[in-house]
């Protein structure tokens, strides 16, 4: 266990590169093919661990977490457990609904908000009665399987803490940087972090990089967003935030805002360059938001963070929303249903 990310197992054992992650998934695909050839598992060609499946699993976890009133930090930990596990184990070997339940059960223990095994099994059965067994020992067995595949490294560091530290630092150094994060901006950044767990970012980058990327989307791209909306009404973004009961307001960033940004990354490419960061916004006057952008760029310049990693995180988050816009829950649900119900026949 480590209170410091830089000496933690998360960084030293579980922070991957894109190449190593791709190689791990390639090896898993080869193993899956061998298991199918040897008759250990059946082949379901439509079952893939792609972005659509990850969005579906994310939504399952949120549904179960809300029934149990689980803290957001435990949900985030459960998502990373799930991502790590599915690097090593094929979807075609397991019950994904039991995986979601087990990840949340283990995460609640680690994040010191434990749920009784009978309660979490009962709530999961209420949601997915055809997939969750009544026997609680099945969940306990899966927990050992999960921990083994993660090499027993369970303690995690999340961007939420980094986000709050940045907020506090900006407040304390307002005289130097001349701006701070508003409550709305903090909430927007927090919600973006929630959604970022669908991606591979938490296997690839340090938490503070992801936190800065979400602030960048909220602060810097907000000016582009306002020009891209063209007066259109925005849908509410149904994600778990700092306060799940807070209704979105007109300043909130929504999925279609990020969708528009996914088709044109000029603002992303300007990161770290305060002068060019404002010229692309249709020659707007230096209003309050533009001044804030320049001040945030100054903070970024002083922070000495890896800007290439920040750009990488921003692009992944925006791409996620582009995929989410085309997401079809029923198609993913049907594919998993066919696999799990046919397996039990």
Swiss-Prot record:
Superkingdom of the source species: Eukaryota
Keyword Kinase belongs to the record: no
A Pfam family: Cyclin_N
SUPFAM superfamilies (alphabetical): Cyclin-like
A Gene Ontology term for the protein's cellular component: mediator complex
Subcellular location field: Nucleus
Record GO terms (molecular function): cyclin-dependent protein serine/threonine kinase regulator activity; RNA polymerase II core promoter sequence-specific DNA binding
Keyword Nucleotide-binding: no
Major location (coarse): nucleus
Record key words, sorted: Activator, Cyclin, Nucleus, Repressor, Transcription, Transcription regulation
Residue ranges occupied by any Cyclin N-terminal domain in the UniProt entry: 23-147
GO biological process per UniProt: cellular response to heat; meiotic cell cycle; negative regulation of transcription by RNA polymerase II; positive regulation of transcription by galactose; positive regulation of transcription by RNA polymerase II
Subunit text: Component of the SRB8-11 complex, a regulatory module of the Mediator complex.
Biological role: Component of the SRB8-11 complex. The SRB8-11 complex is a regulatory module of the Mediator complex which is itself involved in regulation of basal and activated RNA polymerase II-dependent transcription. The SRB8-11 complex may be involved in the transcriptional repression of a subset of genes regulated by Mediator. It may inhibit the association of the Mediator complex with RNA polymerase II to form the holoenzyme complex. The SRB8-11 complex phosphorylates the C-terminal domain (CTD) of the largest subunit of RNA polymerase II.
Family to which this protein belongs: Belongs to the cyclin family. Cyclin C subfamily.
Name the UniProt record assigns to this protein: RNA polymerase II holoenzyme cyclin-like subunit
């Amino acid at each position: 266990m480590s209170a410091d990310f830089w000496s933690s197992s998360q960084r030293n054992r579980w922070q991957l590169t894109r190449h190593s992650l791709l190689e791990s998934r390639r090896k898993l695909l080869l193993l899956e093919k061998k298991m199918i050839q040897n008759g250990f598992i059946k082949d379901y060609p439509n079952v893939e661990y792609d972005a659509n499946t990850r969005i579906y699993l994310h939504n399952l976890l949120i549904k179960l977490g809300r029934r149990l009133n689980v803290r957001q930090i435990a949900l985030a930990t459960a998502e990373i457990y799930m991502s790590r596990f599915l690097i090593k184990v094929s979807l075609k070997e397991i019950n994904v609904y039991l995986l979601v339940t087990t990840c949340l059960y283990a995460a609640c223990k680690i994040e010191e908000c434990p749920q009784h095994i009978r309660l979490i099994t009962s709530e999961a059965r209420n949601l997915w009665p055809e997939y969750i067994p009544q026997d609680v020992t099945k969940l306990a067995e899966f927990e050992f399987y999960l921990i083994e595949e993660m090499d027993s490294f369970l303690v995690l560091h999340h961007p939420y803490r980094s986000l709050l530290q940045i907020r506090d630092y900006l407040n304390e150094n307002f005289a130097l940087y001349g701006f701070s994060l508003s409550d709305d901006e903090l909430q927007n950044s927090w919600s973006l972090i929630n959604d970022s767990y669908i991606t591979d970012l938490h296997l690839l980058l340090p938490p503070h990089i992801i936190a800065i990327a979400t602030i960048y989307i909220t602060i810097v791209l907000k000016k582009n967003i306002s020009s891209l909306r063209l007066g259109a009404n925005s849908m509410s973004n149904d994600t778990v935030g700092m306060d799940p009961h807070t209704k979105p307001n007109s300043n909130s960033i929504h999925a279609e805002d990020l969708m528009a940004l996914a088709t044109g990354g000029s603002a992303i490419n300007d990161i770290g360059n305060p002068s060019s960061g404002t010229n692309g916004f249709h020659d707007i006057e230096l209003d309050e938001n533009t001044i804030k952008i320049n001040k945030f760029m100054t903070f970024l310049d002083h922070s000495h963070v890896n800007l290439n990693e920040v750009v990488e995180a921003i692009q992944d988050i925006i791409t996620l929303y582009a995929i989410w816009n085309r997401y079809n829950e029923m198609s993913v649900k049907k594919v998993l249903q066919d696999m799990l119900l046919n397996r039990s026949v």
